[in-house]
Every structure is written in structure tokens, then in C-alpha cells.
Design a protein with these regions (language model features):
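Conserved interdomain linker/interface between the two RecA-like ATPase lobes of SF2 helicase motors
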Residues: 149-221
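Conserved helicase motor
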Residues: 57-61, 82-89, 110, 222-225, ...
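Walker A/P-loop
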Residues: 22-44
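Conserved pre-motif I regulatory segment
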Residues: 1-28
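Inter-Walker segment of RecA-like/P-loop motor cores
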Residues: 62-96
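Post-DEXD/H (motif II) to motif III coupling segment of the RecA-like Helicase ATP-binding lobe
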Residues: 107-169
Length: 450
């Protein structure tokens, strides 16, 4: 055996086995980015008494996993690693598969993935899926593939165990995405690209120089054009930067990544390359330049910078306000197979933000009722959006209170009228409620008191 698993990895593995023992044939294992899920499924494949098919969604991940199997001295005589698209086109070329492992299972197209899983299930194979964020972009359920789910540690626990590093979160500016259209669960790329003005590039470069000039950073951009522009802006500022995307030739990509690992390149800008499982060492800072409505994508991007190293603290510079949509990297999240994740609440019940940004040092922190920034200790002034929501809440409370008071007044009036025993009682009721003496006279006469 080439791999020694950690306690939490063994617990996840045991949990999956327990579900299989109950009769489930398809189990989804959830483990936060950086939790070492690839080591878990490599151990599974190594122990399988039959042929194992490992499915990935990109050829780069296939090559990476094959390399990891070899590096850990795991024989691959009965292990096949292939993209789900390739397997879908020639499913009959893979006979006698006993176990199917699906890495980054939430990223597979539902129809293609289901066809592949159903094919091998008919042959008697069982399926184990792995994901750090089991929610598809379009919000659709994953219960069409998996019948049960086993959860491993979340980000906060892995930070506590020193398996992920702590972080500092800065939000020097944000962008207004309220008017952006969505397509398949996320903002339309062309609209996001138009939103990202050159002024934002200048600000992120200034903040990088101020906060983490010695750290190597990865920048997540919204398009190839955007990524290239950001790399050019960093280079013009005297900071070695390079752009990568899925179309970058393999040899060129390997050369640039080697230069990054060697410290020759300080900033790697990319589009969807390092946010989907592909790993790269040496990242000390994450630059968020792509607003996203996808929690899964946001978690993957944050996770690239949280790989553990002694004394490392990752710097996250969020220039697009993703924290306001998705919270902080180590927030606890409730996952279900239905793809529904409890949405991050921007406001507390009192109208204040659940996550605040200090306007002085730009640090982002959880709102625990502090009157000042826990980092720079400047007094925290309520944001205009907080004040607006607080005012709306107060107006609602006033309205509700007025309605309740009026209902109580009417109930008391009804009771007083019922208990009136003489004309004088009606004149007293009129006085208390601001009614005229004519009202009292009429009521008393109706009762026969006058």
C-alpha cells in the first residue's frame, strides 16, 4: 500500500463503506478543498478487488491523477483514469468494471454522467463520487446519480487541524452585479467582462503591492481577454506575471508553472483552470477578479490558496464582493443531495451585515456585534446599505406595533361598551377614545339609559 491516510480521511472512507454495506450502490463523499480527497480515492482504487474506473472532467486532471498514482507507487494494472466524455463515447471498451470513482462529481453534465453511471451499474459496478462542493451550477439535484451522502471535515476543521492554512480576507472594492444576467446559474461572461474596468486592475495591483508583495498569487479572471489584460497590467507595473487558460499548449503551461514554482513568476492569471481541481504549489495569495453566483466555484477558488505550509497565512484580495454573496471560506455549510444550499444571509435580523468590510484597513470579518474593526480597531461606521435595511426594519416594526395597538384598542373599546351600565359610562368611553359627546349620547339612548 502506497498511501497512509489521516484520521479524518479514514473516517470518510469508513463512512462510505458503511453506506455500501447498507445496500447503497452510489455514494457521494464530501470533503473540503485541500482535504486530500484524491488520496482517499487512490487508496480505494488500490484496495479494490477488481477493475476501477476513475472519471474526471478534464484531460489535465487525468494526467495529474495518473502522475499521483505513480508517485505513490500504486500499481495501475486494474486502474483506468479517463475523462467522462471519452468514456461516454466508448463505454463498451471498459468491461468488468467493479468500481467507478467520480472526481469533482458536481462538475459533470448530468445527462452524460448519468448515462455512464447507469451503464456500469447495469454491469454490477458501484459508484463513489467525490466533491468539495456538491452543488451544480444550475442548482439541479445530484440525487439522480447518488442515493446517499457522507460528509467529511469542512474548511474550518481542516484549518484547526493544520491541514489548511489560516487566511486574511481583504475587500478593497466591489462591483455592482445587480443588473447582470445569469446563464446556467452564473453571470454571463460578456456582461462581467464589460463590468471589469481598467481602474479595478490598477486597484488590485496597488493592494497586492501593499498587502503581499512577496507572495506568489493566482488571479481568477472572467475571460481569456480579461486574464491577459490583468497579466499585462501586472507586467507593466514591474511584477512578473503570466496568463494561462485551457487552450495554453501543454508544454508552455508546464514551463510557466515550473517558473511559478521556482518564484520566477509572481502572479498567474487564469480562467477556469485552477478553480477545478488542478493543483499548483506555492500559492500564497488569491486575487478574486471574477464575480460569481456559484458557491461551488468560489469555494474552489478560495481553496487554491489555503494549501497548508508552516507559518503560512493566505492573503485573499476580493475586488468583486464575492464574500457578500457567499460568506467567508471557513463558514459552515449545510450540504444536501438536492443541490440546495442554505443561502448566505447578507443581513442579520437587526439589519446589519453578517460579514463586514472595514472601510479603513479593508479587512473582511464576521459580524459578532463588534463596534470596531477587530484588526485595525477603527470604529465601524454603519454602511449605507445597513442603514437602509435597519430603517426598513424599524418602519416595519413601527407599522406592526401600530396595527397591534389598534387591534388592542378596538378590543378594549368593545369590552368597555359591553360592560357599560349607565349613560355616564358611555361619556367616559368617548373621552378615553377621543369620540364626541354625540357618539356617547347616541349609544346611551340605544341602551335606554337616556
Amino acid at each position: 500500500m502506497g498511501i497512509t491516510l489521516r484520521d479524518y480521511q479514514l473516517n470518510l472512507l469508513d463512512g462510505a463503506r458503511a453506506e455500501l454495506a447498507k445496500g447503497h450502490r452510489s455514494v457521494l463523499c464530501v470533503c473540503a478543498t485541500g482535504g486530500g480527497k484524491s488520496y482517499i480515492f487512490m487508496d480505494m482504487a488500490d484496495r479494490c478487488k477488481g477493475k476501477t474506473l476513475v472519471l474526471v472532467h478534464r484531460s489535465e486532471l487525468r494526467d495529474q491523477h495518473i502522475s499521483e498514482f505513480k508517485k505513490n507507487n500504486i500499481p495501475m494494472d486494474n486502474i483506468i483514469v479517463e475523462t467522462v466524455q471519452t468514456v461516454y463515447r466508448r463505454m463498451d471498451s471498459y468491461p468488468d468494471v467493479r468500481m467507478v470513482i467520480a472526481d469533482e462529481a458536481h462538475l459533470f453534465m448530468a445527462r452524460t454522467f448519468k448515462a455512464v453511471i447507469d451503464h456500469f451499474a447495469e454491469q454490477g459496478a458501484y459508484t463513489i463520487g467525490f466533491s468539495a462542493s456538491p452543488c451544480r451550477l444550475d442548482g439541479s439535484s445530484m440525487s439522480d446519480i447518488f442515493s446517499t451522502m457522507v460528509e467529511g471535515p469542512q474548511t474550518a476543521e481542516l484549518i484547526e487541524k493544520k491541514r489548511l492554512c489560516p487566511y486574511e480576507y481583504y475587500a478593497p472594492l466591489t462591483v455592482d452585479v445587480s443588473e447582470l444576467k445569469k446563464q446556467r446559474g452564473d453571470y454571463v461572461t460578456t456582461e462581467v467582462e464589460n463590468l471589469m474596468e481598467p481602474a479595478i486592475y490598477g486597484r488590485v495591483i496597488a493592494e497586492y503591492k501593499r498587502l503581499c508583495p512577496d507572495k506568489q498569487a493566482i488571479a481568477f479572471c472572467c475571460s481569456i481577454k480579461h486574464s491577459q489584460q490583468v497579466a499585462d497590467q501586472f507586467a507593466e507595473a514591474g511584477i512578473m506575471a503570466a496568463h494561462l487558460d485551457g487552450n495554453t499548449p501543454k508544454k508552455e503551461r508546464e514551463r510557466l508553472m515550473a517558473a511559478f514554482r521556482a518564484g520566477e513568476i509572481k502572479v498567474l492569471t487564469n480562467v477556469n483552470l485552477f478553480s477545478e481541481g488542478l493543483s499548483v504549489d506555492g500559492i500564497g495569495a488569491v486575487l478574486m477578479l471574477r464575480p460569481t453566483a456559484s458557491l461551488a466555484l468560489c469555494l474552489q477558488q478560495w481553496g487554491r490558496g489555503l494549501r497548508y505550509a508552516e507559518n503560512k497565512v493566505c492573503t485573499i484580495i476580493d475586488c468583486v464582493g464575492n464574500y457578500s454573496r457567499h460568506g467567508l471560506p471557513d463558514d459552515r455549510r449545510e450540504w444536501t443531495l438536492e443541490g440546495k444550499v442554505k443561502e448566505h444571509k447578507e443581513h442579520n435580523e437587526d439589519g446589519t451585515f453578517t460579514v463586514r468590510q472595514c472601510p479603513f484597513c479593508f479587512k473582511v470579518f464576521e459580524n459578532k456585534g463588534q463596534k470596531e474593526c477587530p484588526y485595525c480597531h477603527e470604529p465601524y461606521p454603519l454602511h449605507s446599505r445597513e442603514l437602509k435595511v435597519i430603517e426598513e426594519i424599524e418602519l416595519k416594526r413601527i407599522t406592526e406595533a401600530e396595527v397591534k395597538a389598534e387591534e388592542e384598542r378596538k378590543a378594549r373599546l368593545k369590552e368597555d361598551i359591553r360592560n357599560a351600565r349607565c349613560a355616564q359610562d358611555f361619556f367616559e368611553i368617548a373621552r378615553k377614545n377621543g369620540y364626541s359627546t354625540g357618539w356617547a349620547f347616541k349609544r346611551a339612548r340605544m341602551r335606554g339609559y337616556i
